[in-house]
UniProtKB/Swiss-Prot annotation:
It is an enzyme of class 3 (hydrolase). This is Intermediate cleaving peptidase 55. It comes from the Eukaryota. SUPFAM superfamilies: Creatinase/aminopeptidase, Creatinase/prolidase N-terminal domain. Residues 1-19 form a transit peptide.
Amino acid sequence: MSGYIRTLFIRNRFSNYRLRSQIIKYKYSNVSYLNKSALRCGQATDSTHPHILQPGELTPRISAQEYKTRRDRVASLLEDNDFMIVTSAPVRHMCGAAFYEYHQDPNFYYLTGCLEPNAVLLMFKNGASGSYDCSLYLPSKNPYIEKWEGLRTGSTLGKKLFQIENVYDSSLASSVINALGKKSNRIFYNYQTGYLSKMPAASAPEFIQDTLTKLFRTSTQRSVDELLHPLRSIKSTAELECMKEAANISSNVYREIMRKRFEKEAEMSAEFNYRFCIGGCDRSAYVPVVAGGKNGLTIHYTINNDIFRPDEMVLVDAGGEFGGYVTDISRTWPINGKFSTVQRDLYQAVLNVQKKCIKYCCTSNGWSLADIHFESVKLMHEELKQVGIHGTKREITDILYPHSIGHEIGLEIHDCSTNNGYQPLRKNQVITIEPGLYVPEEDGWPQWAQGIAIRIEDSVIVGDDKPFVLTSAAPKEIEEIEALKK
């Protein structure tokens, strides 16, 4: 401090009074900042946001101890001298300076509970002792940047918040990666999907990109997914509580929206996004599908810019996210509140398939998700024959019902995507069951059915002897749906 004052005095030739004023201003503004930073981190805490977090929670429903247990579990899967590098998600921009809402990388979040960008988790399995080293690298405290971008946790507060002993400034990460990379046998890294998978370092924080690029030129990397997806697949009690919360909120939103009348897809889409948030979710888990009439023939229809026509149905695929965990629901209902005879028959056919498939979601059957899908195709074939739609099983899977019966959900809407769908289901996996029917406007299919699209989807916890449907409060029985608009 004395050097700073001496330089300031010589350079600016302050009077004693002005120099004293500058010292006081500098001193107390800095102390004020430090006091505030000691109370507030780069994410919500149980002391600053008690309306979000209960005492002891690092993220909603989940404690720092549970995150440590997860790190211990993945460390037990590492071999001697294995090195794991898990980076936070990058900030993504729409264009120029306009950025998207930040969403953390699911693997990084699963292991740390940290919600900040530009962070790195390193884990190294010691060959001699069998123990593992774990270190977290966070952006340093910086009053100027925090004024623009929000608070940072920093290394000092990070040790206490995340209960990781070794938390350092992110500027130190490159040297550690370089040193550990040289003596590692296998390197695990969290590759991003899409084109970034061909440039693995491109999605990493800028301060380690050069280091990773050099390291990856001389080593072979494996995806952390092969270690983490099997662990993430089986949900803990706390994780299931998050998913129940997301499902309950989302199911109630469906019920309320089904009561109302809308003229435009955009209005209904906005209502879903709004109600998820005011109901207690963090955000929509994904861009809602709100498809009126034949728009539902596009399975991932998200443009949501058409008008509703009274004699048509609307297919909605939307769900909320709570504490990082998502729910996935699809419902189809008539715009005017009353199913026509054709709509009723086709809807009931799909519903029958869905309800039968849900019953298979238990470990006692020994079935895999693939087994349930193959059974759903058989059931769909039988149901459609009864209502007058005749097609081969190949035509059903290629045209009328071209997607799978379901997928895992959790921190991602298609969670643990590297898991083998042919493995028997395990207790506390959470999956979707979502048969669909999409009759194209083409010759060869009954005129009376053309343009009709139906999907019915629930989020389901796999049990030992019977499943638990998380989203059962979202109406799907015909009588219940019709009663909502009376």
